[in-house]
Amino acid sequence: MTDDVVDESSDEDVPQRGHNRQPIVSVLGHVDHGKTSLLDMVRSIGSQRQASVMDREAGGITQHIGATEVPADVLNETCAAMLGGKQFKSPGLLFIDTPGHHSFASLRNRGGSVADIAVLVVDIMEGLQPQTIESLNILKETRTPFVIAGNKVDRLHGWRCEKGRSFIESFSSQREDVQALFEERYWKTVGQFSEHGFNLERYDQIRDFRQNVALVPMSAKEGEGLQDLLAVTVGLAERFLEDRLTDTLGSAQGTVLEMRDEVGMGKTVDVILFRGSLRVGDTIMLAGQDGPFTTHIKGLKRPQGMAEMRDAGKRWVNFDSVEAACGVKIVAPKLEATIAGTTLHLANTSEERELAEEAIREEWRAVFNTMPVMCSSCNSIFARQDFQEHTASGPCKGAEENRSGVVIKADTVGGLEALAFELHQRNIPVRQATVGPVNKKDILMAKSATDPLQKVILGFSTKASTSDVASQLEED
């Protein structure tokens, strides 16, 4: 007999996993509820730390691509009081600043949202607001787990804040009347979330995180409760998203946030890389106005130190290679046609190119199928994929699309989808939907509509392509 244990299972039965990458965290919230203050406070941890380690290239928080990367050592130091001597397994957190809900919606790949987990910032004094509800709907649609940052506890009358203190420690030090004020606001917020089908509970009182959404009370302005929020976010990601966070092998993929014209660099694209790695010289495939196209990476860049992406100026650091998950600025030829919100694919081999092209075309088919169209028989409005089912049987069997509708334009795929969704809710069909500036073809298409009410071009974060087009729009 031998003590050796023979594993008879095939290697093919065990999914191949890569290294444990940092979770990608998207921050959402209603205007003025404190999303910007929260991100600023997260960044301030790094600036304070960086001041004490100025000679070290590592350490601190790196700003890049509309994202804030919080390294593991900063997380462990910030949350030390809550960790009790333990340390996180995660190499860090990558916060993505999503300035609009359509931006979050565009951070997706074919498997769902690129964001692994989200933080929804809610002003505990105001509760749920229209954009909060919109955010909840998007999180539900993309099946993204999330944590609630119950912000602005400092606005409770008599609440005493202390920067960096945990909420648990803070709450126990407040007067009884102040605690009662908090409980009143807390239970009101719980009731509002319940109306939308979510079981909300204070994070330190949850027994099963699968059944309840965690609320972390905090003050983003003062930094109180920040360590609680970071600890809960990392803890949930490590506990429930292990398979997703180790799914890093295979050809590189990333979401294009935007195309920019940088002085001294030319056309560049800002990308969130969520799988694989990229090197200078790699061939990549992107979605363009005329379909998929390939180009070669000439440079991979990140801002130096704490510099913001949009204000980095000449303070860029060049990299030979980058690994997921990270944000990176890519310098390459022929990027001007790139469509923001689409997926970048590595395309070094013929097999990779073939798979990338099909994935990009499938991505566009999915967008095309969300457009609202009118049934030629009953004049009802359906999303295109639902229209096909509607006309397969019943009184409208064999009916065709009524080629009427408005023209819509947006700066990103997510913007296009958001606009189409709003129009569908209002029973307005879409005749043509494209990404990019309004051009003469769009004007001709709108003019050709038979219904006067549909001689319209609706733009979402976009403008006229030339001054001539702008003048024509004003005249019409």
What feature does the model see in each segment?
Residues 1-30, 36-96, 159-220, 233, ...:
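P-loop NTPase nucleotide-binding/switch module
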Residues 17-20, 54, 61-62, 84-89, ...:
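Conserved catalytic network of the ASCE P-loop NTPase/AAA+ motor domain
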Residues 33, 101, 126-127, 155-158:
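Residues immediately C-terminal
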Residues 34, 225:
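Conserved glycine(s) of the Walker
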Residues 105-126, 133, 137-147:
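Inter-motif core of Ras-like GTPase G domains
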Residues 131-219, 232, 408, 414-476:
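N-terminal intrinsically disordered, low-complexity, charge/repeat-rich segments that act as generic
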